[in-house]
């Protein structure tokens, strides 16, 4: 006791000579050190054999957030090598159990509604952007009805009508954009493709009134609303930050604008003159007999605009960047159009797009390596036993599926990190479709349980815009191939890294590519 008293007396005398700020700093460092020690001891001494292994980490709350956020795929593969397909890591204080491989995809993406919940995870982030009472801000049964409305609105007639509209938008953009005025030049890929995809989507899906506004008011509103997906909003979506105030103002203004469009159409007698989604939703009725309210139509249109734009813009940018590294593939695409469609290159149609096999493979291969969403997370609502193991995932965890891991795995795709559209010439990989289909309330869809290739997800939350995405990407790619040759800048090798900081992954930073107009484009 005398020794302890002597030590404490010495500490007190030393502290009495220090400033308050120094003492506060020492106190905080001491608390941090103690918390780190306790955290490490808990991991080493109190392992639960009935739960997946926890990825070792030094700091509580932070856990593995930083290493995961920098490069999720590297993190997943490193952890898989050490812990196997099932492991848990700390993501911003939340225990998140990852289950990789096709079994993991099935376990999570096809999890029963009573066991897993997407709304609890994504609603805080998406509701301020999309608006109330749609997508994740409503009961799952209502969401399934909303997905059915949108899916059934993408009829074959609608899709056929979109091809000439998308073609015209791309050609008009190239003709009028300052970036493409010369025979040769350099352009900012992500910026340019983002404009092309937003114009093509708004012209086709959104309607002519929305498209006309993108040359003025909508562009700024879209940008402000897009800031709602900023990384900090994963934690603080309701914080009174400047970008969130702009987000909220943009959401209100966009909602008002869509409702004005709907009101004007109703006052004009609701005479349908196009195949856009607004007309489709205006005629939809919920199962309880309630017509879809105009505000909900507006919010669904915003959700379509935001979610679809991110995924299409990112994928189309990667296609251009990949083609710039492989001019030989781009020339193959051009020759395919001449061979299949004719040397006069007739206007693109829905039917002749289906004949462009290599074009489809370029899109498929790009989605394999660059799926816009790398992680799909669900909250656990009931304890979930993992077949073949002793693990039971408790309700205090989230679960995470990463279909991109199987798409990058050697066991399914030889030389998985090589971008090679011709790998799809042979049936070396399982089809994206699955024999077993299920109706979650919006029509039969493949469960996708056995496929290593799921760029559009699987289960009840599978993307309903898959057909439109392939159509939009296919048309944009085909038009660009007709007009240009792309190549990397001198001294540039390969493609840029990936930015994983937002909900949707995309090329990191600004990426520039050389273009050269084809003779046919110059004459036109």
UniProtKB/Swiss-Prot annotation:
Induction profile: Over-expressed in azole-resistant clinical isolates.
Enzyme class, UniProt record, top EC level: oxidoreductase
GO molecular function, one term: sterol 14-demethylase activity
GO biological process: ergosterol biosynthetic process; methylation
Regulation: The activity is completely inhibited by miconazole and reduced by voriconazole (6% substrate conversion), posaconazole (10%), itraconazole (16%), (R)-N-(1-(2,4-dichlorophenyl)-2-(1H-imidazol-1-yl)ethyl)-4-(5-phenyl-1,3,4-oxadiazol-2-yl)benzamide (VNI) (20%), and (R)-N-(1-(3,4'-difluorobiphenyl-4-yl)-2-(1H-imidazol-1-yl)ethyl)-4-(5-phenyl-1,3,4-oxadiazol-2-yl)benzamide (VFV) (31%). The weakest inhibitory effect is observed with fluconazole. Activity is also inhibited by ketoconazole, as well as by the azole-based drug candidates VT-1161 and VT-1598.
EC assignment: 1.14.14.154
More about this protein: In Aspergillus, the biosynthesis pathway of the sterol precursors leading to the prevalent sterol ergosterol differs from yeast. The ring system of lanosterol in S.cerevisiae is firstly demethylised in three enzymatic steps leading to the intermediate zymosterol and secondly a methyl group is added to zymosterol by the sterol 24-C-methyltransferase to form fecosterol. In Aspergillus, lanosterol is firstly transmethylated by the sterol 24-C-methyltransferase leading to the intermediate eburicol and secondly demethylated in three steps to form fecosterol.
Name of the molecule in the record: Sterol 14-alpha demethylase cyp51B
Protein's organism: Aspergillus fumigatus (strain ATCC MYA-4609 / CBS 101355 / FGSC A1100 / Af293)
């Amino acid at each position: 006791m005398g020794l302890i008293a002597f030590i404490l007396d010495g500490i007190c005398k030393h502290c009495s000579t220090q400033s308050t700020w120094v003492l506060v700093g020492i106190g905080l460092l001491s608390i941090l050190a103690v918390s780190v020690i306790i955290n490490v001891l808990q991991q080493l001494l109190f392992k639960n054999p009935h739960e997946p292994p926890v990825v070792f980490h030094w700091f509580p709350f932070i856990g593995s957030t930083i290493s995961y956020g920098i490069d999720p795929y590297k993190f997943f593969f490193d952890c898989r090598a050490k812990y196997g397909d099932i492991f848990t890591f700390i993501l911003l204080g939340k225990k998140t159990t990852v289950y990789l491989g096709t079994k993991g995809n099935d376990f999570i993406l096809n999890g029963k509604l009573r066991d897993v919940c997407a709304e609890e995870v994504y609603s805080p982030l998406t509701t301020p952007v999309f608006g109330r009472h749609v997508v994740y801000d409503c009961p799952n049964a209502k969401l399934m009805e909303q997905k059915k409305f949108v899916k059934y609105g993408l009829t074959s007639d609608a899709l056929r009508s979109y091809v000439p509209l998308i073609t015209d938008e791309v050609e008009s953009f190239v003709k009028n954009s300052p970036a493409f005025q010369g025979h040769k030049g350099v352009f900012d890929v992500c910026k340019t493709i983002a404009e092309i995809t937003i114009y093509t989507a708004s012209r086709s899906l959104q309607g002519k009134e929305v498209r006309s506004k993108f040359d003025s008011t909508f562009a700024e509103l879209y940008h402000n609303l897009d800031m709602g997906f900023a990384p900090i909003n994963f934690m603080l979506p309701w914080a009174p930050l400047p970008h969130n105030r702009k987000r909220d103002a943009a959401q209100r203004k966009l909602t008002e604008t869509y409702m004005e469009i709907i009101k004007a159409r109703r006052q004009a007698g609701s005479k349908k003159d196009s195949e856009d989604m607004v007309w489709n939703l205006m005629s939809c009725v919920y199962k309880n007999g309630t017509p879809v309210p105009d505000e909900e139509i507006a919010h669904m249109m915003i959700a379509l605009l935001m979610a679809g734009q991110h995924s299409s813009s990112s994928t189309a940018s990667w296609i251009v960047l990949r083609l710039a590294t492989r001019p030989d593939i781009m020339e193959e695409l051009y020759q395919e159009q001449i061979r299949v469609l004719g040397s006069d290159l007739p206007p693109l149609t829905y039917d002749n797009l289906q004949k462009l096999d290599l074009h489809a493979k370029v899109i498929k291969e790009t989605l394999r390596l660059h799926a816009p969403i790398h992680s799909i997370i669900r909250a656990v609502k009931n304890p979930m036993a993992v077949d073949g193991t002793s693990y039971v995932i408790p309700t205090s965890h989230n679960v995470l599926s990463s279909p991109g891991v199987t798409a990058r795995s050697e066991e399914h795709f030889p030389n998985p990190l090589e971008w090679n559209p011709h790998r799809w010439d042979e049936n070396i990989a399982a089809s994206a479709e699955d024999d077993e289909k299920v109706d979650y309330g919006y029509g039969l869809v493949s469960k996708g349980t056995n496929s290593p290739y799921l760029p559009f997800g699987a289960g009840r939350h599978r993307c309903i815009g898959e057909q439109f995405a392939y159509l939009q990407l296919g048309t944009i790619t085909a038009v660009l191939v007709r007009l240009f040759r792309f190549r990397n800048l001198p001294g540039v090798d390969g493609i840029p890294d990936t930015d994983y900081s937002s909900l949707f992954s995309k090329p990191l930073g600004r990426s520039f590519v050389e273009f050269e107009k084809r003779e046919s484009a110059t004459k036109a």
